[in-house]
């Protein structure tokens, strides 16, 4: 579901995996901007959400996933490696991910190596072309370098 009001857009996704840990948060920060009443909602545990986002990147290689991973890392979130391992064991690759770019050894260290390699090769041009519909130009400038720095810090080789 997408909510829009003036310049603010919020997208809500609903997942039904009942076994995933969650915690309760208030929507007040967003709903105040939209003139809606706040609600208490369950949200996915951040380490699990990071693992799922990393697995999603592995399966589709979208830079918006890289941005989301970077955002979690900047917040100091540590990945749930057990969840990540379970997700990379059975990937559902997009047809857009060439076989040569798929994870060969389905282990967490091999995944980190692949992730580091892909992030190291990113350019500002690629980031801008992919994320220009989502972020203003002022935020795109130098973002590839910020990705590289944060990923290297989180997953040193």
Predicted regions and their residues:
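Structured mid-to-C-terminal alpha-helical surface segments
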Residues: 1-157
């Amino acid at each position: 579901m997408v909510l829009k009001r003036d310049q603010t857009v919020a997208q809500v996704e609903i997942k039904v995996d009942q076994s995933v840990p969650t915690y309760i948060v208030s929507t007040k920060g967003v709903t105040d901007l939209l003139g809606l009443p706040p609600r208490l909602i369950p949200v996915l545990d951040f380490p699990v959400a990071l693992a799922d986002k990393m697995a999603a990147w592995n399966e589709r290689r979208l830079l918006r996933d890289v941005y989301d991973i970077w955002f979690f890392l900047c917040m100091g979130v540590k990945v749930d490696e057990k969840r990540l391992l379970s997700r990379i064991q059975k990937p559902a690759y997009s047809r857009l991910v060439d076989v040569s770019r798929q994870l060969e050894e389905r282990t967490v260290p091999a995944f980190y190596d692949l992730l580091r390699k892909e992030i190291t090769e990113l350019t500002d041009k690629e980031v801008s072309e992919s994320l220009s519909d989502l972020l203003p130009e002022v935020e795109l400038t130098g973002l590839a370098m910020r990705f590289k720095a944060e990923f290297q810090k989180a997953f040193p080789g």
